[in-house]
Amino acid sequence: MKDLERDVLRKAILEFIKKGHVHYTDIEKKTVATCLRFATSNTFRKQFYDYLLPNGYVERVSRGTYKITPKGEKLLDILT
């Protein structure tokens, strides 16, 4: 996956989460449906669990529900 594709995917994920506390499954379905061909369930999962969550851009509110952090909002501004 190229850097530009990663950035597009991360931006889409953060935009969906910014709309409110969203369930993981809804975020995944919306992202895979609206992004380009490179956005598969596997690439979504890797970006979400291996990058956004561990680096503090997204935080877990309750089981399966996530929200964007201030750090995540800064990243979204940079990507926009």
Which role does the model predict for each range below?
Residues 9, 44, 53-54:
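Short histidine
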Residues 24, 60, 68:
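Short beta-strand "wing" residues that participate in macromolecule-binding interfaces
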Residues 22-33, 38:
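Short acidic, hydrophobic short linear motifs in intrinsically disordered regions
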Residues 38-49:
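Major-groove recognition helix of helix-turn-helix-like DNA-binding domains
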Residues 1-20, 80:
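Short alpha-helical segments that sit at the start of domains
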Residues 50-61:
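A short, conserved structural fragment
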Residues 6, 63-80:
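Short, cationic-aromatic polyanion-contact patches
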